[in-house]
């Protein structure tokens, strides 16, 4: 059984990680331990590079905290060019896999508040009246009318980031 450390305690992210690992490695193939670690970037990262740096830093910090795991996984959400997205970083002892998620354009009224310094999650909670929406369906669930959720979009990115770990051609 794979010991997987999730560098987040966010339920939407943990669900995405668990589903992806089970799809790739089989049901019941992993145990996930969630840890709270720092990203080393602002609460609301801007730009692809800052967001990816946050995910990489979370993996590094999770490895320092739980060095005996088989995999360390981080999902860092950010804002880039008027849209929200995330970077997924997965490492084991030999290699790293990274993938950027799908991108959701944000309405101007939401972007205005985020650019003024508020994090997207609290802004969306104010807009929708849903407490801690970032730990649930997220802006993605709201603006896709539930066709996608934050977790489902992260799930795809985790699957992509796992590609180097089960395809020999990457080694």
From Swiss-Prot:
Residue numbers binding Mg(2+): 38, 68
The protein, known as: Inosine/xanthosine triphosphatase
Species this chain originates from: Enterobacter sp. (strain 638)
Top EC class of this enzyme: hydrolase
Subunit structure: Homodimer.
This enzyme's EC code(s): 3.6.1.73
Keywords: Hydrolase, Magnesium, Manganese, Metal-binding, Nucleotide metabolism, Nucleotide-binding
Cofactor(s) annotated in UniProt: Mg(2+); Mn(2+)
Cofactor binding mode and count: Binds 1 divalent metal cation per subunit; can use either Mg(2+) or Mn(2+).
Its job: Phosphatase that hydrolyzes non-canonical purine nucleotides such as XTP and ITP to their respective diphosphate derivatives. Probably excludes non-canonical purines from DNA/RNA precursor pool, thus preventing their incorporation into DNA/RNA and avoiding chromosomal lesions.
């Amino acid at each position: 059984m794979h010991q997987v450390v999730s560098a987040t305690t966010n339920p939407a992210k943990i669900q995405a990680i668990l589903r992806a690992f089970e799809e790739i490695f089989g049901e019941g193939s992993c145990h996930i331990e969630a840890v709270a670690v720092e990203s080393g970037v602002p609460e609301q990262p801007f730009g692809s590079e800052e967001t990816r740096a946050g995910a990489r830093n979370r993996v590094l910090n999770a490895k320092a905290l739980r060095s005996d795991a088989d995999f360390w996984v981080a999902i860092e959400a950010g804002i880039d060019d008027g849209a929200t997205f995330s970077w997924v970083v997965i490492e084991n002892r030999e290699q790293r896999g990274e993938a950027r998620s799908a991108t959701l354009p944000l309405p101007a009224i939401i972007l205005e508040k985020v650019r003024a310094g508020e994090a997207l999650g609290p802004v969306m909670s104010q807009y929708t009246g849903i407490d801690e929406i970032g730990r649930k369906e997220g802006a993605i669930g709201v603006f896709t009318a539930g066709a996608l959720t934050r977790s489902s979009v992260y799930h795809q990115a985790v699957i992509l980031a796992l590609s180097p770990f089960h395809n020999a051609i990457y080694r």
